[in-house]
Structures are given as structure tokens and as C-alpha cells.
Amino acid sequence: MIKHSRIVSLIILLVLPATLYSKPAPQSASDVNVSGAVAPDKIKKGRSVRATVVMDMPNGLHVQSNKPLDKFLVPTKLDVETPSGMNVGPISYPRPVMRKLKFSKANVAVYEGKAMIRFNVTVPANYSGGSGEIKGKLRFQACNDDSCFPPVTREVKMWLNVE
């Protein structure tokens, strides 16, 4: 009997620390970090800059692509607002990864890890405004391998200095 209780105690001592310190699986879209940057952040009139919105997803979480293969999935979509007079070029979404998940019968097109959405902002030569804020509104649906979470919209702000 003492030998049996020692074995049980040893198993508990070995398993308990791993359970206490293990990172929990992603539970919602709030686990997706969204950030943005403009490079360079200073621009002369008559020039363009590249802006990037980055979605950083932890392991175990993915986001639907901008063109999901199932009509019931919500596409990732970025809307961009700039100061009056600046122009936004076409938005370039990353190439999705094709995955077969537990809840899907067919492959789904998703973004995993780090996904970068890019677009150009042009300041015309006759631009009369000053520096300004570029605002992105990113709508996406995050999922894990078992289920999808309700869609969310995140706002990203980037500053552009016009010289």
C-alpha cells in the first residue's frame, strides 16, 4: 500500500508543475494582437509610403482569410481612412494557408502566425494639409481547431508626417 501511494505522489509531483505553468489555449479573438506601421513615417508631397497592418496570432488560433471558401465564414476586411486629400492604393492581403479543421468537412483558407496586410498611401504634390492620422478598421473572425468566435472589429492608428 505504501509503495502504491508513493507512485501516486510521484506522478502528482511530476504532472502538477507542468499543468500549473502551461500556457492555456487561445480562447477568443482578443488573443489576436493587431498593430500598424507606416514606413517611412515621414513623406514629402508627391510621394507614397507603404503602410502595414499586422495580425499576430498565437499557436492554436487562426483567422479567416479575406476570401474564405465557405459562405458562412466571415472574411478578414481592412477599411482605411486617411486625412482628406491623401489617396489609398489597393489593399494587399497575404496568401492564405489551406487547413482541414475538426469542424470543417473541406479545407478552409486561413491566416496563421503573423499575417501582414499592406497598402500604399500617396500624398499628392498639391496636398494642402499637414501631417495626419491613418486609421484602419480591421474586421476578422478568429477560430481555434474546434470552433469559431464572433467576428470583431479592431481599430489601428498610424501617424504620417508630411514635410
Q: How would you name each of these model-derived features?
A:
Residues M1-L10:
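Bacterial N-terminal signal peptides that target proteins for export
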Residues S9-A18:
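Bacterial N-terminal signal peptides
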Residues Y21-E163:
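Extracellular/lumen-exposed scaffold segments
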